[in-house]
Amino acid sequence: MKPGAIQVAKGIITINEGRKTLEVSVTNNGTRSVQVGSHFHFAEANGALSFNRDKAIGMRLDIPSGTSVRFEPGEEKTVTLVEIGGRKTVRGLNGMADTYMDERGKEKTLSNLKKAGWMEEAIR
């Protein structure tokens, strides 16, 4: 093996096995492209995106780490979300959630999304 080389296991690598998943339809109602990264709390994604945010609380994209999904203006696509793992804590992002994702934390996040107007049609 050469210094700096990457040695990858043979076979198929399964990610997020055993975690709750959800398919959600997303439309970009904005005028600019929106890109969402693999570990971003999806309920807090850009306000120009229209989707069922209450079901996305505590979820992120079910894609490999370090990758992202791009939504072009006017585009509608279906993505798969996966439950946030580990300690299930969401910090920062757009300030809608800063909590552990238990039922109480999900209620707090939903309340913040409603106050910000993000539960209505997408922000244009």
UniProtKB/Swiss-Prot annotation:
Identify which top EC class this enzyme belongs to: hydrolase
Q: Which GO annotations describe the biological process of this protein?
A: urea catabolic process
Q: Which is an annotated GO molecular function term of this record? A: urease activity
> How does it associate, per the subunit comment?
Heterotrimer of UreA (gamma), UreB (beta) and UreC (alpha) subunits. Three heterotrimers associate to form the active enzyme.
Q: Which reaction does it catalyse?
A: urea + 2 H2O + H(+) = hydrogencarbonate + 2 NH4(+)
Organism expressing this protein natively: Bacillus velezensis (strain DSM 23117 / BGSC 10A6 / LMG 26770 / FZB42)
Spell out the GO cellular component terms annotated for this protein, sorted alphabetically and separated by semicolons: urease complex
Q: EC number(s) for this protein?
A: 3.5.1.5
For whether the record's keyword set contains Protease, the answer is: no
Q: Which family does it belong to?
A: Belongs to the urease beta subunit family.
The name this protein carries in UniProt is Urease subunit beta
